[in-house]
Swiss-Prot record:
Keyword set, alphabetical order: Hydrolase, Metal-binding, Zinc
Positions with a binding annotation for Zn(2+) 1: 53, 55, 111, 128
Pathway: Secondary metabolite metabolism; methylglyoxal degradation; (R)-lactate from methylglyoxal: step 2/2
Subunit and partners: Monomer.
Protein name, per record: Hydroxyacylglutathione hydrolase
Reactions catalysed: an S-(2-hydroxyacyl)glutathione + H2O = a 2-hydroxy carboxylate + glutathione + H(+)
Native source organism of the sequence: Blochmanniella floridana
């Protein structure tokens, strides 16, 4: 199986997986025009669309894709049922049989109430749950759910490749340094990424092994982060660190 990316709406990633006979799966098509052009250019035949959640920047392309490819099947969480297309509802415990491959569904509530991810071999399509050095915004009342979702990701094999829904790496690393200004690994990685982007090279995917080191949202038990926030939660309340980090990140985005 091969994977290619389609840049959409400035920061969105649409992922396309295809096999040796040019059949493909499209993940989170936020628009259709670029996807159709790419499919035509590579002579790919779409068999399925996978949706991680119901936000329009991940689903806007579905209706037009259905018109072009009427036999295509759409899989997504229950929250995608309210859109203008029919979806096969899936959740954790389901294994999709597509292109003679098995794709596992994982529940990642937090960014939205019924957000899901798709796990294929060592590839995780995480939607807006986790980004390189960051995580998605959290719906009100779902901080603890998001914390558990991030814990679930941390328990995956360390060689997992993470294909997320947006490219925010540079911004996320700068925020991480504002929390951990002495973290040499994050500082050096920011320098590396800055050079890559200056050469107009695209990023993604990242690895879980790397994210465990550079992503503050995966380090809620880290005493250095707790000191930076001046917040020392009781055992079992580490989600409060996630909440504090996300609040700071939201303010950081407003200022930057």
């Amino acid at each position: 199986m091969n994977i290619i990316k389609c840049i959409s709406l400035q920061t969105n990633y649409i992922w396309i997986i295809y096999n040796h006979i040019r059949q493909c799966i499209i993940i989170d098509p936020g628009e259709s025009l670029k996807v159709i052009k790419m499919l035509n250019h590579l002579q790919l035949i779409p068999e399925a669309i996978l949706l991680t959640h119901n936000h329009r920047d991940h689903t806007n392309g579905v209706f037009t894709l259905i018109q072009h490819f009427p036999k295509i099947k759409i899989y997504g969480p229950i929250e995608t049922q309210n859109q203008n297309f029919a979806t096969i509802t899936v959740s954790e415990g389901d294994t999709l049989q597509i292109l003679n491959q098995e794709i596992k569904v994982l529940n990642f509530p937090g960014h939205t109430p019924h957000h899901i991810g798709f796990y294929y071999k060592s590839w995780l399509f995480s939607g807006d749950t986790i980004f390189s050095a960051g995580c998605g915004t959290i719906q009100t009342g779902y901080t603890q759910a998001m914390y558990k979702s991030l814990l679930k990701i941390q328990c995956l094999p360390k060689n997992t490749l993470i294909y997320s829904g947006h490219e925010y790496t540079l911004l996320n690393l700068n925020f991480a340094i504002s929390i951990l200004p002495q973290d040499t690994l994050i500082i050096n990685y920011l320098k590396k990424i800055t050079k890559v982007l200056k050469k107009n090279k695209l990023l993604q995917p990242t690895t879980l092994q790397l994210e465990l080191k550079i992503n503050p949202f995966l380090r809620c038990n880290d005493i250095n982060i707790q000191k930076s926030l001046n917040l020392f939660p009781k055992p079992g309340e580490e989600w409060k660190i996630l909440q504090a980090l996300r609040n700071k990140k939201d303010l950081y985005l407003v200022k930057n």
